[in-house]
Each structure stands twice: as structure tokens, then as C-alpha cells.
Amino acid sequence: MSSGRIVQIIGAVIDVEFPRDSVPSIYNALKVQGAETTLEVQQQLGDGVVRTIAMGSTEGLKRGLDVVDTGAAISVPVGKATLGRIMDVLGNPIDEAGPIDTEERWGIHRPAPSFAEQAGGNDLLETGIKVIDLVCPFAKGGKVGLFGGAGVGKTVNMMELIRNIAIEHSGYSVFAGVGERTREGNDFYHEMKDSNVLDKVALVYGQMNEPPGNRLRVALTGLTMAEKFRDEGNDVLLFVDNIYRYTLAGTEVSALLGRMPSAVGYQPTLAEEMGVLQERITSTKEGSITSIQAVYVPADDLTDPSPATTFAHLDATVVLSRDIASLGIYPAVDPLDSTSRQLDPNVIGQEHYDTARGVQYVLQRYKELKDIIAILGMDELSETDKQLVSRARKIQRFLSQPFFVAEVFTGASGKYVSLKDTIAGFKGILNGDYDHLPEQAFYMVGGIEEAIEKAKKL
């Protein structure tokens, strides 16, 4: 246990001088004496000086304070004791429910599983959300990104997915709140409590008001807990909200560490940092990690380096669109922009594949005809195009669905729609079985039976 002293403080970055024969290794955790602060070594500057990031507030720290090297990376509690608890980046409980009852702790920096250890699978994960199950189905053990700008419904979609999957799936879940609003973390906790699934979820929060060190490492803390469950042979769900804030924290830290910024001011190590995190989120022969990540898209620009880097790692992408949200269609998933590796007739079956592609064709054609309709009106279209437009508008409305987690806002009770019912409903619309129903009947309903009932009342 070598000790050193603080020689410089720049915001969240602190330089510590050690004797030259006992300089701590990269990623070692250091403890500041007389303060609660933990530091993580990022660079060795030479002459016994290391540059560190503070995992917590740097208020009250000053030059000359003693710092002790713990000789290991930051470690966090893992295992069943973490379920139902809220923890911070260091694994300390922040829910005022006493200490976490476990001896076992794992370091947050771990190697990704080797190629030989990894296992792939084609099992589908049913979410009960029509548009997702139809157009961008999730794979069990896959990675999913929810992309969207500010206020189009990433977190609400995420909470609905957690609710549906946690209740239907009955496995363990880990939720990492990375740089999001504390209010959302609070809502989320109560939502889990009310749904009686809190005893299956471990919650790790590093919210918006935390220093960049916490926001940078909290995703790794959550991932480490998920890896422990996976290695015990479980199928785990890992939810990260929001992966963009992880990148942003890296940007803040990178500038303070004195690295030269790259495109749009991001850190030069953006792709590597993202890779280190994403490569660990994988399924092995022991168990699987299915991860669902919300990705904030700055200024609705999907070509921004941060979302663009994230795209490369995902199996399915759910793109939320402001244009669709402005039509009042929620979830505001863009069925033409969202994709999945699972959308393959050999994986999901021919019927599902044909229905999904049929829906996309009709919506794409409607999009092309919109300009003609805007200039010349519906009357100038051929009969087949008129029919197609009518079906497209029904499909568009049928892609909406009331959510359980939004019941308090909308007053409409949530709906879980099985994959079988989803395919049957859209197939019927494509085949013209419901051409006689008004399009309002398809808005904000669950299965097609409900639309038929609703039409009778209109």
C-alpha cells in the first residue's frame, strides 16, 4: 500500500505524486485520506506523477492531501444481494436500506469473453410491442439500440420494454442509469416496485448531476453485475439509459486529461471506449446478456460520431422519429428506418418476413405518393394507389399502441400483443380484409379484434 500526495487539481482530474519505485498501475483505485473520494488512475506522467479521475465530487480536496493506492481496480458487489437495491458507481447503496449483504466483489475492468467462449443464438425475444416485434424483432442475447432525439420517447419505450420483458421473462435484469435525470431514476424505481419485479432488478445510477468520472464508469459497474449473473448460467437483461452520456462523460474527461479532440470535439479514443464496453456485452456458453440501450441522437443527426459509432455494435436498431411523434403515433418507431439482423425468413419464418416486408413496402409507397397527393389531391391517383394509401394509413395507425407505463398520463390501459396476433393483424390489413373499417378504429388499440370492436362504436 504505497501512498502519495495530491499535487494538482483541475476540475475532476487530479494529479498525484508517488515515490518513483511504487507508482500505481493504470485503472488502480486510489483513496484520498480524510475524504470519501476515490480516484482512478488514467495516465502515468513520469517522475512518479499519475493523472487520475475523481469518482465523486472534488469539493474540499486540496494540494498536499495524502492518497493511498489500494493496489487494485474499483470493485463492486455482485450476486443476488444486489437485486432490489440502488447503487452508485462504486457499488455503495444509495437507497437507505442498509449495507449490501455480500462478500463477493468483482473489479469493473474485465476482459471480454474470447471468441471460443462466445455463443450465438437465433431465439426471438417477444416484447409485446407490435411495431418492434414485426419490423425489428429482438434476438435473445442480442444488442438493441433505441435511437431518438430529445423528447421522442426513448425512456418511456425503455420502461415499457423492461416492464413487458421483466414480467413475461422472469429472469434477472440490471439497469444502468448513465447520466440521465434523477426524476426518471426515481420513477423507474417506483414503476418496478408497483409491478412487483423489483426483487429481480439491480439498479445502478450515475445521474446527470454527478461528476464525469461517475458517468464514465457507471456503465461498467452495471455491466460487471450483469456478467456475474450471466456466468452463473442465467439469461440476463441489461438496460443502459443512456449510452450517449457515457460517450459525453468520456469527452469531458478526455479534454481534462489533455488529449487532442477529434471530430465534433469528441475524444480521439471514442471508437475504442465504445468497443471496450460493447464487446463485454455478449452471450457465452454459460448464459446470455440481452442488452437494450437508449441512444440520444444530438440534433436528430444519426451521422453524429457518437450514435454512428454505436450503430456498428448493434443487432437491432429501433429508430424513433420526430415526424411520427408529431402525428400523435406512439411508440414513434420509424418502421422504414429500424432494422434487425433477425429479419430473415430462415430465422423468423416466411409468413412473418413477408408481412414485415409487405408493411414496409406499403408505407414506403405511401411516402412516395404523399407529394402527388399534396399537389394534385387523392382524386388523381389510380384505383390501386388509392387502395394502397387507405391501407397504409390504417397500418400507420395500427402501429401505435397504448403502453402500460403511460397509463397514468393517457388514461388508456396498456396492451401486450403476442407476436402471433401482431402478424395476423397486419397480414389482414395487407390482404384487404379490413378495407371496410374506418382508419380511426386502428388508432391506439392492441390486437386487430379490438380495432373491429372499436369500429362498431364509431
From Swiss-Prot:
Alphabetized Pfam families for the sequence: ATP-synt_ab (PF00006), ATP-synt_ab_N (PF02874), ATP-synt_VA_C (PF22919)
Entry binding sites for ATP = G148, G149, A150, G151, V152, G153, K154, T155
Localization, UniProt: Cell inner membrane
Which top-rank group of organisms is this from?
Bacteria
- State its Enzyme Commission number(s): 7.1.2.2
Q: Which residues form the signal peptide?
A: none
As for membrane topology, the entry says: Peripheral membrane protein
Single Gene Ontology MF annotation? ATP hydrolysis activity
- Which keywords, in A-to-Z order, does the entry hold? ATP synthesis, ATP-binding, Cell inner membrane, Cell membrane, CF(1), Hydrogen ion transport, Ion transport, Membrane, Nucleotide-binding, Translocase, Transport
Q: What does the annotation say about its assembly with partners?
A: F-type ATPases have 2 components, CF(1) - the catalytic core - and CF(0) - the membrane proton channel. CF(1) has five subunits: alpha(3), beta(3), gamma(1), delta(1), epsilon(1). CF(0) has three main subunits: a(1), b(2) and c(9-12). The alpha and beta chains form an alternating ring which encloses part of the gamma chain. CF(1) is attached to CF(0) by a central stalk formed by the gamma and epsilon chains, while a peripheral stalk is formed by the delta and b chains.
Which family, according to UniProt? Belongs to the ATPase alpha/beta chains family.
So what does this one do? Answer: Produces ATP from ADP in the presence of a proton gradient across the membrane. The catalytic sites are hosted primarily by the beta subunits.
Protein name stated in the entry: ATP synthase subunit beta
Record organism: Pseudomonas fluorescens (strain SBW25)
